[in-house]
Amino acid sequence: MHSREIRQSFLDFFAAKSHTIVRSAPVIPADDPTLLFTNAGMNQFKDVFLAKGTRPYTRAADTQKCIRASGKHNDLEDVGRDTYHHTFFEMLGNWSFGDYYKEEAISWAWELLTEVWKLPADRLYATVYHDDDESARIWAEKTSIEPSHILRFGDKDNFWEMGETGPCGPCSEIHIDLTPDGSGKELVNAGDHRAIELWNLVFIQYDRQPDGRLEPLPQRHVDTGMGFERVCAVMQSKASNYDTDVFLPLFQRLSELTGVTYGASMDGRQDIAMRVIADHARTLTFALSDGAMPSNEGRGYVLRRILRRALRYSRDLGCSGPILHQLVGTLADSMGDVFGELRDRRDAVERIIRAEEESFITTLDRGMEIFGELAAATARAGGRMLKGEDAFKLYDTYGFPFDLTRLLATEAGLDVDGEGFEHCMQEQKSRARSDRREKQQTGDGAGSWQWFSDSHATTFLGYDRLAMPSTIIGAAHASGHLLLVLAETPFYAESGGQTGDRGWLESAAYRMQVTDTRKDGDSFVHVVSRAFDKVRDTEIDPMDIVIEEATPVDASVERILRQETERNHTATHLLHAALRRILGSHVQQKGSFVTSERLRFDFSHFSKMTPEEIQAVEAEVNEHIRCAAHVSKHADLPYDEAIAKGALAFFGDKYAERVRMVEVPGISAELCGGTHVDNIGQIGIFKIISESSAAAGIRRIEALTGRAAEMLLWKEYHELQDVRQQLKLKADEAVAEKLAELQEEKKELEKELAGLKSASVIDALVRDATSAEEIGGCRIVTKVLEGVDADTLRSAAMALREKLPVSAGLLCSIADGKVSLAAFSSDVAVKEKGIDAGKLIRLAAAAVKGGGGGRAELATAGGKNPDGVAEACRIFAEDVRRIAGAV
């Protein structure tokens, strides 16, 4: 039975039992911050089990894509070393939400296994929880299983719990005996691959209380899971999951790419490599197809670790270049009919993986060299343990995940100091936290705060007001600045990438200029850098101002600066939406910086944007701006409601239970606490001024809006007009064509000039050579020329050997700190004297710390030591004298 048929027969079986066949949830959980990856079939129904959600059906079945590569469910380091661990797998499952219970679940499982799939009943065992008499009775009375094959186990094996508290219940597992003689009873639940679990039937009937008590649930549920690859191996009578047709297309493609056949290696090393690569290619392809991106944190780093681990194993197959991306199409072809996203995202996933491979290959080579040196040094010192700081260096400098270093160490017969590595990691994190704290401080050397209120919190009212009265509740001085905290403020404090507002605070005695507003916990700190004494009508040092308790002030934000900032902030939302539509849904915001002057937006993407893509994004944003749509700001929404309305939220971002959503209907919806325009038409113009790399896998766009964009366009227009005037272009003549024409003329003139220069150099050399030293009838020419390029030098050498019938020489040139050498030997000198320019130039080049070679008649070399040129000439001349004088 083909794997495709096995999967479909499972779904058909439960569809006939009135189950709704649901789609697999993405392997990237959309609304569960506790998970990096979907790791079980029940994940998408977790809210039902927790009584926080419902479904329009009470019976369901599916095949769920799962990844187990992090946390307690982590099979990563076992993959490849055996034949049954995977980081990606499918989980077949059926569920009852307060509908049927144990009897139906057990009876149907037995029916599918023995009557539909025809598995031998005498090889099947059912395990039950030690005091679950109900399940044991159902197995005995409602199925044909042998009574002696009903086995009881305790909490460890047969009691399922979602967490320390919450839904839980007994489970019943179905195992199959794969021993040759059917003697596997004692191997059940013993971790032996000869008696493996096929199917786990979980009966959720209790609610675990904080004190450990089990309270009956008002509704009982069924949650079952069966490993698809494992059941395929059993159904197809294969020795392992990797021998099934699930993996066959991948192994065939790997064989085409590497010339290595799975199962043919003598020591098993290449088989391990093929298993690792096949498994990891599946994980990467499915994860990226569901919107994940490799990165340096969270799930992105797990994927990067997996990719780099696979690349390391590809070396065991003789691969030195990218290979993983070439398996994406194989998966799309073999599994795309079931998981359509593999076909839909094929091209994008291939590009992402290839870019990651190419990025790591160079550092992999260098890192492998460094590891080899460290391992050799450890062995020479009689040690068996690689230092933690060395492992951290490989991680920090060459991108080697710790598990990759540990793998290499194991292969070299070494251990790695994991505690030392972790210590280095924590030290780096501490330094980073310290740096962040320093950046968040309102000023160096800030004195102690003087507080006039028990509460240090500021209420922000600046969404609707730019000016208002308030009261100072805190004050401090730091590095020439006065720092003030107000009870209420219209000033936006820097956060979410948006810079703090600027403006004025005015008390009865002082007028104070606020040049920045920053957050410090719940306090909004207004940074005063200039102040004026209203009584004396003079400017004073902010450090000299003494704030009295409960000082009232009028706070006013610079309106124009705020409006320009709002234009740029709303533009980042439009830009994000356009990037996701044009480049793909893998695009996620990775950072932003919004000021009144410009905006900067960092986003996940695997390659440099083409000019066409940049133009398309810019055009789409401007098209939206021209639509002049209203911007809706939904304050204090429940998080779930905001997500239901389509707001973007990404794993790793922290959100409160109640959020603020900024929406441009039909275009963009994001969770955002920043300030925005009321209508996107107010943005005016959007102009991208640069696109660059911010980090591996992260691109950066800088752009202008409003007046700044308008001024840039006017500046560029006037510069273009100046160029047209200088080029004396007619109205219908294009600047680019004229410049190309001028550049071509310039090249021709440079070529002509180089020819004249070369001829001049050659003429001078020939004149000088007539008086050169002569030994044994052979002229010896050595000459150092300043600023002559290598081509001219070579041409001069060729001319001299033609002009001087019996001669040998070395010409040298120094340009930009580099040395070029050209040696020649005339035909007579080669044939009758045995003077070989190719051999002699190699000896001379050593003096300039270089190398080279060529024919006996003509040879070239280069070097990086200009101070050695005289010595090179001396060596060459001495060698020619020796050879010519001996003939």
UniProtKB/Swiss-Prot annotation:
Q: Where is the sequence biased in composition, kind Basic and acidic residues?
A: 425-441
Report the co-factor binding details.
Binds 1 zinc ion per subunit.
* Localization annotation: Cytoplasm
Region feature (Disordered)? 425-448
Q: By what name is this protein known?
A: Alanine--tRNA ligase
Show the GO cellular component annotation of the record.
cytoplasm
Q: Which GO terms describe its biological process?
A: alanyl-tRNA aminoacylation
Catalyses which reaction?
tRNA(Ala) + L-alanine + ATP = L-alanyl-tRNA(Ala) + AMP + diphosphate
**GO MF terms held by the record:** alanine-tRNA ligase activity; aminoacyl-tRNA deacylase activity; ATP binding; tRNA binding; zinc ion binding
What family, per the record?
Belongs to the class-II aminoacyl-tRNA synthetase family.
Transmembrane in keyword set: no
What's said on domains?
Answer: Consists of three domains; the N-terminal catalytic domain, the editing domain and the C-terminal C-Ala domain. The editing domain removes incorrectly charged amino acids, while the C-Ala domain, along with tRNA(Ala), serves as a bridge to cooperatively bring together the editing and aminoacylation centers thus stimulating deacylation of misacylated tRNAs.
PANTHER family recorded? ALANINE--TRNA LIGASE, CYTOPLASMIC (PTHR11777:SF9), ALANYL-TRNA SYNTHETASE (PTHR11777)
In terms of Pfam families, this protein maps to: DHHA1, tRNA-synt_2c, tRNA_SAD
Q: Which InterPro entries match?
A: aa-tRNA-synth_II/BPL/LPL, Ala-tRNA-lgiase_IIc, Ala-tRNA-ligase_IIc_anticod-bd, Ala-tRNA-synth_IIc_core, Ala-tRNA-synth_IIc_N, Ala-tRNA_ligase, Ala_tRNA_ligase_euk/bac, DHHA1_dom
Its required cofactor(s), as named, are: Zn(2+)
Q: What is its EC number?
A: 6.1.1.7
Task: State the gene name recorded for this protein.
Answer: alaS
Q: What does this protein do?
A: Catalyzes the attachment of alanine to tRNA(Ala) in a two-step reaction: alanine is first activated by ATP to form Ala-AMP and then transferred to the acceptor end of tRNA(Ala). Also edits incorrectly charged Ser-tRNA(Ala) and Gly-tRNA(Ala) via its editing domain.
Binding-site list for Zn(2+) = H569, H573, C672, H676
Q: Which UniProt keywords apply?
A: Aminoacyl-tRNA synthetase, ATP-binding, Cytoplasm, Ligase, Metal-binding, Nucleotide-binding, Protein biosynthesis, RNA-binding, tRNA-binding, Zinc
